[in-house]
């Protein structure tokens, strides 16, 4: 019953978002563990099982640890139908994993420190700034910025983000990023921008250069004084675990 309610609320939320030919999602699980070494030992087994059970449904999966000790496990899915299948089958697949790997499942459960928070996010296609050959496994670091915007100004916010990116390119500011919007699990006026790089050192070396170029541009600074005001709710630095 709870699963049906979740799916219903999810697709009601999706129905309010403009339809694209293929929509891109990720399903996010957040929690903490007591011992990262135990997680590192067991997660590859659980990950391989999850990939096998979701073959043809899930495109990719990646786990990160944040500087605050939180786990971020992201499962990437293309298309509404596949998203529905993934969510509908998740509990059943977890039960099958426990049956097939009881010792590992118990270790992982006992190692969890707190409840899991689960959420679903949809890519804002116009705010994807990644190369055609991008592979997430080639980048071991990600900065995430979560923010909320007024519910009635989301479209204006997305246009503003695109304009600022294009203005940045004019002054030589280049970086990788992709912005996602919450569908379920967070307020639906929440956006998450993910900025991948090779390492936190590389990211902030490049960041300092970008900030200097922005600081020197009157046009860019003027653009920041107007438009939709957003409220940053979280900044985190993620290191790839697996």
Each model region followed by its residue ranges:
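Bacterial Sec-dependent N-terminal signal peptides
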Residues: 1-22
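Short S/T/G/P-rich N-terminal loop/turn motif that feeds into the first structured element of a domain
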Residues: 18-242
């Amino acid at each position: 019953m709870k699963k049906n309610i979740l799916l219903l609320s999810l697709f009601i939320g999706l129905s309010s978002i403009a339809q694209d030919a293929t929509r891109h999602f990720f399903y996010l699980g957040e929690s903490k563990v007591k011992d990262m070494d135990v997680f590192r030992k067991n997660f590859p087994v659980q990950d391989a099982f999850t990939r096998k059970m979701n073959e043809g449904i899930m495109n990719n999966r990646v786990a990160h640890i944040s500087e605050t000790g939180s786990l971020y496990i992201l499962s990437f899915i293309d298309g509404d139908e596949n998203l529905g299948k993934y969510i509908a089958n998740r509990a059943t697949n977890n039960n099958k994993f426990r049956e097939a790997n009881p010792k590992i499942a118990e270790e992982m459960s006992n190692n969890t420190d707190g409840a899991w928070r689960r959420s679903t996010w949809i890519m804002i296609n116009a705010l994807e700034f990644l190369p055609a050959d991008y592979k997430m496994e080639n980048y071991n670091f990600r900065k995430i910025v979560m923010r909320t915007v007024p519910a009635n100004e989301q479209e204006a916010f997305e246009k503003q983000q695109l304009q600022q990116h294009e203005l940045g390119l004019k002054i030589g500011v280049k970086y990788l990023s992709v912005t996602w919007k919450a569908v379920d699990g967070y307020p639906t006026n929440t956006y998450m921008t993910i900025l991948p790089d090779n390492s936190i050192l590389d990211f902030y070396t490049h960041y300092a250069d970008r900030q200097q170029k922005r600081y020197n541009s009157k046009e860019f600074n003027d653009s920041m004084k107007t438009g939709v005001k957003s409220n940053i709710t979280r900044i985190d630095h993620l290191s790839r675990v697996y």
